[in-house]
From Swiss-Prot:
UniProt keyword Kinase present: yes
Protein name: NAD kinase
Catalysed transformations (reactions): NAD(+) + ATP = ADP + NADP(+) + H(+)
HAMAP family the UniProt entry points to: NAD_kinase
Any one Gene Ontology cellular component term annotated for this protein: cytoplasm
Cofactor(s) it depends on: a divalent metal cation
Gene: nadK
Length: 299
């Protein structure tokens, strides 16, 4: 991509530290000839998309939650994002707050490199009419309400029936979201570059529905076959939709829907270790070669 000439900074709303840091970064960028605009909180999708259209980079100051909100509103625009981590995990907002200057110096010194990933696009249909459409960065979760009862869902893939599922819920996750709720439900970790998404049940009745990986172009349809129990769809853990019996959610991959500025350096495995998703138990194996007497070492 071309060198960065303009930056939109989006801060976590109501976070004085983020706003102060945004002012510091804005001054730093202006001194280097880069135009800058600061927005407190992502707000509504349309104004954010309009502001981001003129930016070569959207810099997000907050944690992974703030990154999710911004990335979801900008899904499909192709505008690259970079997160400065003021939160905890920092799997999406990967730049430590104390390293912002060195990171931006590197980004301004060469053409920007980006990593494009799959997002989810979904619609909710009620009585044959689409009542909601949206995008998801991490996942769409269909689950029960306050009562501790299983729900029943009918699942189709590409127009073919897959199964009727009785479970606490269902997680449809992107590769980016595989390290979120899905991995807690024993879904697979996925390389973010994969053109695929997962369908993972939450506590399936009798355990008869393993996690399923679908190609990014697949269409997964989930119909609510439940009477008298509250059912909700939650998008990225941030937005919710109340569902009724007979409602149908249709989901598919949005190729290149997410765009992140990449810094190089550590790869996916290094990030998994750094964020605690895998543990590296170093060990020394015994010498299995025969000794000079022709006998092998006992193990």
């Amino acid at each position: 991509m071309h060198p960065i000439r303009s930056v939109l900074i989006v801060t976590k709303p109501g976070h004085p530290t983020a706003l102060d840091l945004a002012q510091d970064i804005g001054v730093w960028l202006t001194r280097r000839g880069v135009s800058c605009r600061i927005l407190e909180g992502p707000g509504e999708a349309l104004p954010l998309r309009q502001l981001a259209a003129d930016a070569g980079l959207v810099l997000v100051l907050g944690g992974d939650g703030t990154m999710l909100g911004v990335a979801r509103r900008l899904a499909g625009t192709g505008v690259p994002l970079l997160g400065i981590n003021l939160g905890r995990v920092g799997f999406l907002a990967e730049v430590p707050a104390g390293e912002w200057a060195a990171t931006l110096e590197r980004l301004l010194a060469a053409p920007l490199r980006v990593e494009r990933r799959l997002a989810l696009r979904f619609g909710v249909e009620r009585g044959g009419v689409e009542i909601f459409q949206g995008d998801a960065v991490n996942d769409v979760v269909i689950n029960r309400g306050a009562l501790a009862r299983v729900i029943t869902l009918d699942i189709d893939v590409d127009g073919e029936r897959l199964a009727g599922l009785r479970a606490d819920g269902l997680i449809i996750s992107t590769p980016t979201g595989a390290t979120g709720y899905a991995v807690s439900a024993r879904g697979p970790l996925m390389d973010p570059a994969l053109d695929a998404f997962t369908v993972t049940p939450i506590c399936p009745f009798l355990g008869n529905f393993p996690p399923l990986v679908l190609g990014g172009g697949s269409v997964c349809s989930v119909r609510i076959r439940e009477q008298g129990t509250e059912v909700h769809a939650t998008i990225d853990g941030q937005e919710g939709i109340a569902l009724r019996s007979g409602d149908r959610i249709t989901l598919t991959g949005l190729r290149d829907g997410l765009c992140f500025a990449t810094l190089g350096g550590g790869g996916y495995c290094a990030r998994l270790r750094a964020c605690g998703f895998v543990r590296d138990h170093a060990c020394t194996l015994p010498d299995m070669l025969p000794d000079e007497g022709g006998t092998s070492t006992d193990v």
